[in-house]
């Protein structure tokens, strides 16, 4: 009788203590993409002096434009693939008071031809 109690209690205790963490990898998780997908090829198309409409045409609408700083646009992309750690990429685009592109910062460097300007 004593053996039967241990035979039932031990597996239950091990399962409760592990919290099913061993089985977590067996459960399928979908890939989650959120925000504005931006790649280096798109950033390379940006030129110094582009208008806001031209930048919006190349990159799409920004994820965030702060109320107090309408000349700074934020493009944020967040990707979680299955059980892997999430990856976040940021691109910050700044305009001058006239609405012309003056700076690109973040995880993507400006292209080599950025300072050639718009023709």
From Swiss-Prot:
Instruction: Enumerate the UniProt keywords alphabetically.
Output: Cell outer membrane, Lipoprotein, Membrane, Palmitate, Signal
Its localization reads: Cell outer membrane
Q: What is this protein called?
A: Outer membrane protein assembly factor BamE
What is the predominant subcellular site recorded for this chain? membrane
Membrane-related topology note: Lipid-anchor
Q: How does it assemble?
A: Part of the Bam complex.
InterPro entries associated with the record: BamE (IPR026592), BamE-like (IPR037873), BamE_dom (IPR007450)
GN (gene name): bamE
* UniProt xrefs under Gene3D superfamilies: 3.30.1450.10
